């Protein structure tokens, strides 16, 4: 059975795993990429972490079939290079991820956007198995997205497609986004948008955990904030349903475990907002793979791209 190195590069940490051809994670580790305030370039940290991980697992690089990388940012998947970001990640734009990993390990490498990989991981061994038309959305610091249409990942001309967070839902009167535009969906639908609104009401509501705990306790202010937040998420998703006509929408990110307070309201609101024919058969639920989705999806992207299965 073939084995692969899956790498998931985030803004604060890199996750690494040995993944087999059935999508099982056999071993994994995680290292900070921000440990020194990014004075060490992220790619340098990733290369060292990958070497240390394989050594710790006693896995020689030559025993692997290849390396699949999931990476935050706008990823030119054709070249395996970081084409852009919307945050402050020093020395990251232009990072030649594919070339440096191939040089270091003498293995074939593919690189794709992290939200695209999350969606592919779910299609391979998660909650989207057997589906051909899927929208995957991750809610966190921003909003990531991956789109599967007709069984194929929608990547666009350079592999940059699927930047759902920068779909402009408030283009005329919206707040400034880190990308330089106004009114991007993620400024209203990201978990950080909920936290910003909650902090204005009560400084103790500092993260998703404290906010949802207050909601579980029946706090009316928090429940109103959640209602407004899920409205924003649902309105963005409704527009995408009309464009892509998916069978399934998967919602990922740490908050996606909140079935009653998040997933159920979003599902009801999306179905109420779209035309009846689009709501028929539409499923909306939480993603299943959680923290492993990126590395698993990265390996699936590698297999689809390099092995043409």
Which stretches of residues belong to each language-model region?
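A short acidic/small-residue loop/turn micro-motif
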Residues: 32-35, 90, 161-163
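A charged helix-plus-loop insertion that forms the helical arch/lid used to bind
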Residues: 80-93
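Active-site nucleophile and cofactor-binding loops and adjacent substrate-binding regions
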Residues: 87-90, 110-116, 136-139, 285-291
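Glycine-rich phosphate-binding loop of actin/hexokinase-like ATP-binding domains
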Residues: 129-188
